[in-house]
Amino acid sequence: MIDIITTIAKYLIIIMCLIYTLSCYTVFRPKNKDRKEDLLDNQVIYMFVFLFLCYMVLFLQEFELKILIFFAAQVIFFEILMIVFPRIYKRCSRPLINNTCFLLGVGFVILTRLSFDLAMKQFAIAAGSVIVTSFIPLMMHKITIWNKFGWLYAVAGFLLLSTVFVFGINKYGAYNWVSIAGLKFQPSEFVKIIFVFFVAALLSKAKEFKDLVKITVIAALYVLVLVVEKDLGGALLYFVIYLMMLYVATAKASYLFGGLAAGSLAAIIADKIFTHVQIRVAVWKDPFSMIEGRGLQVCQSLFAIGTGSWFGMGLGNGRPFDIPVRESDFIFSAICEEFGVIFGICLIFVLMSSFILFMDISTRSRKLFNKLLCLGFGVCFLFQVFLSIGGVTKFIPSTGVTIPLVSYGGTSVISTLIIFNIIQGLHMLADSEEEEYEYIKAQESEKQYTRQNNRKNQ
C-alpha cells in the first residue's frame, strides 16, 4: 500500500511542479489586479501541496515524527512570510516572495532526504536571515543616497575580499573561505553585493572615458583576487556582472564585444598558466578517463541524472549518496535523480522567472543607479544558476558554484535573501516612481485641458 501511495505521489509532485512553473509565467499576463492576486494565491496552494506530498513520502519511508514536525515548521514559516511581508510592504512583489518560498522549499525537501541535520540547519539560517533582512526594503525605499558612496563600496568590497589572504582556508582546492573565531563563511558571496553597488554607483555618474577606465581597473582587481584564490566560478561571475552593467550603462556594443574578447584571451592564458584550470578543463573534456580520480564528481553527476531519466526514481529511491558534494555544488544532480529531469527543467524555469522579475523592475526604474542595481543582481542570480547547472551537466567545466536558495550553504542563503530584499525595495521604488509620473502626467493633461477651455471661452 505504501509503495502505491509513494508511486502516485511521485507523479503528483511532478504535476504540482509543472503547474507552479506555468503559473510563474501566466502571472505576468493579467492586467486585472484581482485576477493576478487569484493566480498568486493559487501558487501558494500548489507550493504547499508539493511540500505536503514530499514530506508525506519521506515520513512513510522513515516513520519519524521529526519529519512531520519539520514540515509543520516550514508551513508556519512560509505562511508568516507570505502573509506578513505583503502587509508590511504593500507594494512588494508577491511573485518574487512566492518564488523565494518555493525555491527554499525545494532545497529543504532534498536536504531532508540527504541529511536531516543539514536541512534543519539550513532552515534555521533561512528563518533567521528572513527576519534580519526584512528591514532592507524599507531602507532601500527611504534612503536616497545609496549612489553617493561608489568609491567607499569599491574599497570596502576589495578589503573584505582580500581577507582570504589572512584568514583563508582551503576548501575543495580553493582558498575562498575564511575562518574567524570558528565562524566559517565565503567573503565573495557578500562582496558580490557590494561589487554591484560599487559598479552601479560609479557607472551611473561616469561622464568621460577615463572614468570608465578607472572603474574597469578596480573591477579587474576584484577578478584578479578571485583568480589568485582559485575561485574560478567567482571570477567568471564578477566578470560577467561587470561586463553586462558596463554595456547597459554605456549602450556601446563595442565594450561588450571587447570585454568578451578580453575575457576569452584571459581564459586561454589562465589555461596555460594555472594547473588547477588545466585540470578542470581536462575533467570537462573527458571525465570518464579520470573516473577513479578527479573525474568522479562529474561522472557520478551524469550517472545520477541519467538514472533519474524524465520522471525520476522517486523521492527516497535514488542513490544520491554516490554523488560527491551532493548537498551544495551537485544538488541539481540529486534533484534530477529523485524527481526526474522534467522536474529539473521546471526548476530552471522557476529560476528564470525570478530573473525576469528582476529585469522587469530594472526596465521600470527611472533612475540609472536603480536600473543598474536590478540588472547587476539579475545577471548575478541567473549566471550563478548557469554556472552551477552547466557544471553538473558537463555543459561547462565545473566551477563549484551553488544554486541560489536551493543548495546547502549559509553564506549563499543569506546573501541571496539580502539580494531579494534589495530587489523588493527597488520594486517599491519603481512603483512609487510610476505613480508619481502618472500623477504629473495627469496634472499636465488637466492644465492643458484648462488652457484649451480658456482659449475657447475667450
Where do the protein language model's features map onto the residues?
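Long extracytoplasmic/lumenal interhelical loops at the membrane interface
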Residues: I305-I342, S365
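Hydrophobic alpha-helical transmembrane segments of multi-pass inner membrane proteins, especially
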Residues: E64-G293, S333-G391, I418, I422, ...
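Alpha-helical transmembrane segments
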Residues: L18-Y25, M82-I83
